[in-house]
A protein has these predicted regions:
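Conserved phosphate/anionic-ligand binding catalytic regions in large, soluble enzymes, centered on
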Residues: 142-159
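Alpha-helical support elements that line or immediately flank enzyme active sites
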Residues: 159-165
Length: 330
C-alpha cells in the first residue's frame, strides 16, 4: 500500500491485571500498584531503560495535550490526571497507557502502512508483561476488558488515511457503508462529530471478539488497500480532466501557507489537505513527510510549547502561521 495515502498504522492492546478491579481512576493505591507492577515487569524483561515514565499529575496541561496531539495517549487518559501515567519508548514508537478505562493500553504506531510491525511491537510488550503477571482472561471470551466491545483479542488495528478526492467527490457515505459491511468503523481524526478536518480519516475494527489478531489486521489492511486504490484512481482522473483546477488549489494552498501572517485552525487544515495532495501527486517540490511534519507542529499545544507560553485566539493563529512558514522554508 502507498504510504503517501496512509499516514500511519496503529495497533493497540487492552489488558487488565487479573487481581485488580477494573476501574482504578478512583483507587489511587491500586492505580499506583498497576504502574509499579508494569515497571517491574519491564525491568525483569530488560526493557525498562527503553522507556520514560510520565505521570500526568506531574505534567502541565499543555504537555498532556501535546502528547494527545502526537497520538501517544488517548483523550480518555487525560480525564484522570491524578492516577494516570504513560510509559513512552524513547523513539516514541510504543506507549503503554496505564489507568485509563483498562489497566493497560499497549500501543504501537508506525509511519505509513505497517500494521504487522506495529502488532509485533505490541505483542513484544504484552509477552514481557504477561511473563510476570496474570491478565484477566476467560477461556471462552478471551481477554476481559472494561468495555465488552474490546473483549476477545483486546486488539484495535487502525490506519490513518488522507482521502481528499474521495471526500470532494462525495463518496464518503458509500465508503462508510462499505467499511461497515466488513465490521470496521471510519471516522474523521480531527474535528467534532462527522467533521473530518484535513480530510484525514481513521479506519479500525469495531469488535475484537470472535476473530483472531491476524484476521483483524488482514481486514483492516484490505480495506486500506481498497481506499488507497480508489483515491489514487481519482488522482489520475484529476490529472487528466481537472489538472489546471487541481494545480491551482495546490499552489494557492502553498502560497497561503508560506505567506499568511494569521492562520486559523480550520483554514490550516483545508490548506494542509491541498498541500499534501500536491506533494502526493508530485505537483510540489515537497515531500509528504515534510507536509506531515507541518501538521504535527501546527497543533495548538505544540505551538504553545514551541513559544514557551500559553497562547489563544489571534496570538495562537499568528504563531501557527509563523511556525508553518518556518517549516516550509527549511
Amino acid at each position: 500500500m502507498q504510504s503517501d495515502i496512509v499516514l500511519s498504522s496503529r495497533v493497540r492492546l487492552a489488558r487488565n491485571y487479573a487481581d485488580l478491579p477494573f476501574d482504578l481512576a478512583s483507587e489511587p493505591e491500586q492505580a499506583e500498584t498497576c504502574i509499579l507492577r508494569t515497571l517491574s515487569a519491564l525491568r525483569q524483561a530488560g526493557l525498562e531503560e527503553q522507556y520514560d515514565l510520565l505521570r500526568l499529575r506531574d505534567m502541565s496541561d499543555v504537555s498532556r495535550r501535546a502528547m494527545e496531539e502526537s497520538h501517544l495517549v488517548s483523550r480518555d487518559l487525560l480525564r484522570s490526571p491524578e492516577t494516570a501515567a504513560v510509559l513512552v519508548k524513547r523513539d516514541s514508537s510504543v506507549s503503554i497507557m496505564m489507568n485509563e478505562d483498562d489497566h493497560l493500553r499497549i500501543q504501537a504506531v508506525r509511519t505509513g502502512d505497517d500494521l504487522l510491525s506495529a502488532a509485533q511491537a505490541c505483542f513484544c510488550v504484552d509477552d514481557a508483561l504477561s511473563r510476570q503477571n496474570e491478565f484477566a482472561f476467560d477461556q471462552q471470551l478471551g481477554y476481559l476488558t472494561a468495555f465488552p466491545t474490546n473483549a476477545g483479542t483486546g486488539m484495535r488495528a487502525s490506519l490513518l488515511l488522507h482521502l481528499p478526492l474521495l471526500t470532494r467527490s462525495k463518496q464518503m457515505g458509500n465508503v462508510g457503508q462499505m467499511v461497515a459491511k466488513v465490521g470496521l468503523n471510519i471516522r474523521g481524526v480531527y474535528g467534532e462529530g462527522a467533521e473530518a478536518l484535513g480530510n484525514i480519516y481513521q479506519i479500525s475494527n469495531q469488535v475484537t471478539l470472535g476473530r483472531t489478531e491476524q484476521e483483524l489486521i488482514t481486514t483492516v489492511e484490505a480495506v486500506g488497500q481498497r481506499l488507497t486504490m480508489m483515491e489514487q484512481n481519482l488522482e489520475e482522473k484529476a490529472l487528466t480532466t481537472a489538472k489546471i483546477e487541481t494545480e491551482d488549489a495546490v499552489q494557492r494552498a502553498f502560497g497561503i501557507l508560506t505567506h499568511a501572517r494569521i492562520l486559523p485552525h480550520g483554514e490550516f487544515y483545508q490548506m494542509y489537505s491541498n498541500l499534501r495532495l500536491g506533494a502526493t501527486m508530485g505537483l510540489l517540490p515537497l515531500s509528504v513527510q515534510k507536509v506531515d511534519e507541518v501538521l504535527d507542529q501546527a497543533q495548538d499545544a505544540h505551538l504553545c510549547i514551541y513559544a514557551g507560553e500559553t497562547l489563544s485566539g489571534q496570538a495562537l493563529d499568528a504563531a501557527r502561521a509563523d511556525r508553518v512558514r518556518e517549516l516550509l522554508g527549511e
